[in-house]
């Protein structure tokens, strides 16, 4: 069927900010969809609130709106633009929920807008647990015994009938938010209450736990002619019970017999047909390992995290084709973009094994509960490709960016059998490593299978790795053993340690013996047809399929998995850099390992290598391609950390030299450079021992800011108020020694300013200066940023511009630099300089229209700023106000403290723009998920040092009609200031207390600041966590609170009696 001609304009709904459960995969799918629709001649309008994405670039769609994804704002855009149709299935759960809301509000009907791809009835049938169960019964497809519940009493009824354990699945939520497995009544109360709160329709499905079954996923496509295919099937190494986003996944499935494969394939196709989905869909199934009994777990009637993985695993671009199907094209009409010969109705075939391992944020949140269940906790993931599962798995392990090069962790070697058993049964992020350790210690596969029901096939693969370790250790210097180890994916790093040599020695030994990997192509058809895709993976085999051209090439290093501190912003910069390299006439080669991102879409670069970002894996590619050089500026700390080793191998680092990178990162060299340039910085010194640290802190005076050198996202950074806190930090947060010094600075409580600039060594161009709402001390990634600055005097702005230009030239920066300043007592100090792309590059690029990563790349390739039409100086400021607001995923991470500080905690960001600061802030806050009601109650519990500041805030809340609630101490201070307040009981009270008010939704805001100078009081922690669990905005910074007040005041009309007004005027006359 040809494409539809009765529609011209299509609105694509994006997925909003990155949160746990919804990461960069929707930037990839949304970008693909917009391009796909434009190819077909449609006018595309995009709405998304996330400025850090390629999707929100003006070139992606005909019109791009960066606005909050709420009914209020999306309706406004629909009424203004009058699209013929909307496509919500590429915007994740956010897009689907938005479509349902728009339909129910009547806006779509009012404006005559049709939903494309998946009909509203199909969305509701798949997402509403009750409707889905009914449909499965009609199809005769088995689902676990279950019950839809709307309150706790109904939950008790089901459990009494079926017994524990039961799984709670809330309706219309993302990444299993609010759900979990209940083994007893206490867990049932907690999880059901949470699930009902998080479900927008207050509905949960309770089902008998089938934990222990194999979890299998099918990624299926269907068109309007009822052609349906399986793009890829995947198997979770972790049995049912762990969310698929937190599971280690392999593709294609490894343990299914042909009969099982066909049985589940037929079921998946039957379900997509019954739902009438036109596009992509993900079906999750559970299979009993001892019989042919299976269950349908759930269906995602949209493009998902799994479809991004399936696209990258097979090379089959699901989102691109789903968009074409949505406008009426059929699979047998669409040419497969990979082979450019076959049609999209051919099911992909794989002649390799793909492994995906999630990347969790537990290195950031030491206190988080690491147990894995049905609620997702990973922020991102890595993927790797190999010719066997062992190779694929070990490549994925070293892609995780955790400093791990093998399936072993030193701290697990001490575990006894009982502890290992407990942790394997319970399942946490280290389970696979513990399985390997158990096998090393002689535990049998039978015992491990009994503990966690992991399939014997996977346990055998882990045992193969362990047996190979023994071989390697017993045969030092043996080339045959080395060859076998390399074929199994062992790293040079591991072999070097086993043979007591350096990694470089092993690398040289292999080269002398012609033991190097070849590169194979990902072609969707297992080499059955010739393919045109330049998409490769390494393996130890015979024939190399990556043909080196005679064009000059440049390698760009990607940023690896999405994690806190290094998000999709770096992928944005990477993609723009690749485009600039191509524009400059070079061949652009990218190395990355994140299946969710735009940079790993094979159509972006001239060549894509899907490989771990380690020195060994990167050097294999450089040895083959012999590029002009490597760009490390855009891949975050991942790429910067490889620069020194690459240079040791004789590789040219393009842009800022290694020496100058080091000068910005090394404390003493940086201090010397600032002194020479006459630029002030907070007093600080470097410590290499605990004793030194104590002495420095005494000399500088508390409070001090302590952090390790070479970090991203403020990892292990803290503000310390006294000596015992410093000792606690030195013991628990860092391992200090000569190679890993700790930086200790005077902590200045001032206004923080952030600047991004581009330097060519002679000229320094500054696209924008941003002001942070939160004072210095809150990580820049967690602060609300405002552009242009609202409270900087011209004199201070001039100082900042002068310092930026001096730093760009003085540090010999070629490319991008990011500087953080603090304004303290009307003086500008430099806190730090990052000689690379920062997380504000996409935000500023979009606002100012300066494509920063593109310009910087051309500078790196030798085209100076003047040639590109830019000179030295500050870009004229925009008239509108733009706000970048952080977005957190605290609801997914139990027992993590939500207090903001110097260590980054946000997972994503949104943008608000309007004519005034108040309006822009309102949009930014609403887009980030904070509800801003114009009246209600606010709970105030603050530390003594904040009481004075809190009084002014409380007074302003009172004046706009808010009801104030406070515990005795704060209430007394308020009463003394004649501010009406209601006293509430502290949380340790048996009577109705502060936590009850939060639980019952009787407070709209909670203001809670930390008591400094002692370990965080558990009371404060419980108040903050209770707020998160119950969806109440908890403000831990008084600066953020003031920003919200500005918005509330701008939305509220004043109401004063005439007498008050005349009294005020009389007072003014008397004192005039």
From Swiss-Prot:
Associated pathway: Amino-acid biosynthesis; L-arginine biosynthesis; carbamoyl phosphate from bicarbonate: step 1/1; Pyrimidine metabolism; UMP biosynthesis via de novo pathway; (S)-dihydroorotate from bicarbonate: step 1/3
Cofactor note: Binds 4 Mg(2+) or Mn(2+) ions per subunit.
Residues that coordinate or bind Mg(2+) 3: 820, 832
Binding site for Mn(2+) 3: 820, 832
ATP-grasp domain residues: 133-327, 671-861
Keyword list, A-Z: Amino-acid biosynthesis, Arginine biosynthesis, ATP-binding, Ligase, Magnesium, Manganese, Metal-binding, Nucleotide-binding, Pyrimidine biosynthesis, Repeat
Residues annotated to bind Mg(2+) 2: 298, 300
SMART domains documented for this protein: CPSase_L_D3 (SM01096), GARS_A (SM01209), MGS (SM00851)
Region (Oligomerization domain): 402-546
Signal peptide span: none
Quaternary structure annotation from Swiss-Prot or TrEMBL: Composed of two chains; the small (or glutamine) chain promotes the hydrolysis of glutamine to ammonia, which is used by the large (or ammonia) chain to synthesize carbamoyl phosphate. Tetramer of heterodimers (alpha,beta)4.
Family that this chain belongs to: Belongs to the CarB family.
Notes on the domains: The large subunit is composed of 2 ATP-grasp domains that are involved in binding the 2 ATP molecules needed for carbamoyl phosphate synthesis. The N-terminal ATP-grasp domain (referred to as the carboxyphosphate synthetic component) catalyzes the ATP-dependent phosphorylation of hydrogencarbonate to carboxyphosphate and the subsequent nucleophilic attack by ammonia to form a carbamate intermediate.
Protein name, per record: Carbamoyl phosphate synthase large chain
